[in-house]
Amino acid sequence: MATTAQQSPQPVAGKRKGKSQFLPAKRARRGDAGGPRQLEPGLQGILITCNMNERKCVEEAYSLLNEYGDDMYGPEKFIDKDQQPSGSEGEDDDAEAALKKEVGDIKASTEKRLRRFQSVESGANNVVFIRTLGIEPEKLVHHILQDMYKTKKKKTRVILRMLPISGTCKAFLEDMKKYAETFLEPWFKAPNKGTFQIVYKSRNNSHMNREEVIKELAGIVGSLNSENKVDLTNPEYTVVVEIIKAVCCLSVVKDYVLFRKYNLQEVVKSAKDSQPHPKLGNGKEAKLEPDSKLSQSDPPEGNQVAPESIEELGQTEPGSETQAGSEGDAKPEPESQVSEVPKTNENELS
């Protein structure tokens, strides 16, 4: 009798262990199909902020990106497993060559299964990161915003901002400096030049100093070409710095002011405004191309706040900047370089 009483709890204990073993697997579903499962150095993609509904945000992002991705790059093509590339049987004579061929076939088949857009864990609340493959995220996002600005059609509900990320690196000052020296060359290295501003946002990171990062990046831009100048009113280029935990996301975008900090909700509102937009002037319609630049003579969209001091470029600091903090609940986003547009959106989140 005593032995049977002692054995009865064992199946119950076994079931509990079985459940705990399967729980972590549910969190790993976002980065399937052989790709990375979380934001890490060496990725390209699109950083998207939302309003407390990440699952719905991912669904909207896939729908929107696939629609415009097919328009720009054509429909996505897939290859069945039976059609995976394979070498000739004659190469299998050597064991080492056969092993290399097998590894190459596995790698090639994995690349074929990777989707054009794949959601990965961003590491911050209300933030979604969509890894991209085989496309230029900055051109795709600009095309989306340009079309929404012209058509005045609202295509998303929970997506707020959509920022292209052209490169990622480790979020340490020395790593960022080394990476940025090469990353910024296509836009700012002579003979290329232009006016610029730097916007900075940090989430779940306490070891990076905003002032140091902006100062170092501005110095790199100035060293690439002395004719690169800071313009906080209407810059040709905006250097976007998004730090999440130990990963730094970088991009250089155009029409950042016109497209309301790349906020999809605000772009539609500004396009629906019956009055002439401040950037258009005298009621003239803005003519934007995929790689267009805003005219330097356009008036400012709002009262701009000056950034930290950039001694290399002759800028001054008013000392009134708001320190970027870690990610939390839904709050308006404090950009480091550009003040809020007079008509702000209460749903614009970090």
From Swiss-Prot:
Boundaries of every THUMP domain copy: 147-254
SUPFAM superfamilies hit by this protein: THUMP domain-like
Database matches in PROSITE patterns: THUMP
Sites of N-acetylalanine modification: A2
Region (Disordered): 1-42, 75-96, 270-350
A Gene Ontology BP annotation from the UniProt entry: tRNA modification
Biased composition (Polar residues): 1-10
Subunit annotation: Interacts with NAT10. Binds tRNA.
Function: Functions as a tRNA-binding adapter to mediate NAT10-dependent tRNA acetylation modifying cytidine to N4-acetylcytidine (ac4C).
Entry's family note: Belongs to the THUMPD1 family.
Protein name: THUMP domain-containing protein 1
Organism: Mus musculus
